[in-house]
Amino acid sequence: RYLVTGHNQGIGSQGFRMGIPEDLGFSNDQFRNRVGKTFGVMELQPGQVNWGVYNPQPLPGAVRMWVYHVFAGGGKFVCNYRFRQPLKGSEQYHYGMIMTDGVTLSPGGEEYVRITQEMKKLRAAYDKKSRMPKQLASRRIGLLFDMNNYWEMEFQRQTDQWRTRPHIHKYYNLLKSFAAPVDVISEKEDFSDYPFLIAPAY
């Protein structure tokens, strides 16, 4: 997940330094239901990149927020790219958790240190028996989404005004605005698990 690369403006005047919040949630809600019992993020941006439209530093606290979004969405692990910023090469200006001297923490690296300290406290308070409250479970929604359909609709648009992802996100964002638990599912799932099912442009 590379959320700060100049490809979106986010929300507010500094939103371009945090990314679009629904992209995080949608990814969690999609992959949590697609890859089995364990999912996580293999590459999370720890600082500025070198290949974006423009390459700002993430807003202070953004890396920490992204990590917590992954865990809150059911993820079990977060890896980042990269550990150390290289001294030369094509990604010389791509930040890591450690700066080029091999010792100094980058701003994102400092946030990772803080996260690991906080995780130890959270783990101590974790209750394995806790379940989703009934009031929330009653709002559980299945949102049908299929990558093959997505690619087909994007490849052969009926009009240049059509964009599949923003259309799907209109529904997703509305559901999230009233705190509905959403599972992004395929047609192979058991629909009986969901009181509500939405199939935007399916």
Predicted segments with their positions:
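Carbohydrate-binding surfaces of carbohydrate-active enzymes
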Residues: 3-202
